[in-house]
Amino acid sequence: NNASWCVASKDMSKAVGFTMQKLVVPNTQFACFFANGLKDDAVYHFYNRRLKHNIKEFGELVNMVSPVHIKQGSLVQELASKFVKLDGETEDYTAYGDTLMYAGVKLKQSFSATGYSEDVRLYQDFAARLYFMEEVNADDNA
């Protein structure tokens, strides 16, 4: 149901990771990403591609936070979706290569119908995420 891969540059200073899922399994909020091809003792900046989500993806759940009722498929929903986009999760960490490869990165919890924020992943059916890892100078992080 889930697949991921990671490819690193020849000098192991940069890597790109990709994770995807086929179908959502209810109440499985935990996810961990494991990199590969990194230097064990190098420090890396791990971050994700920032996403914006259309409010249509939330369906009727948008009414939990909307000041007015928005009927699914209505003109109001159509107009609101043109102007309102919700920020996706932010994954931004600094860690050693061996940590990223062997312990992995615990990703933000998945959305479970309530409590959406930048600390929650909206990870629906057939969703995917890109993660970037770049070697940084260890002295810059002190």
Which sequence ranges carry the predicted segments?
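C-terminal beta-sandwich/jelly-roll accessory domains of carbohydrate-active enzymes
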Residues: 25-142
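Carbohydrate-binding surface patches
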Residues: 1-41
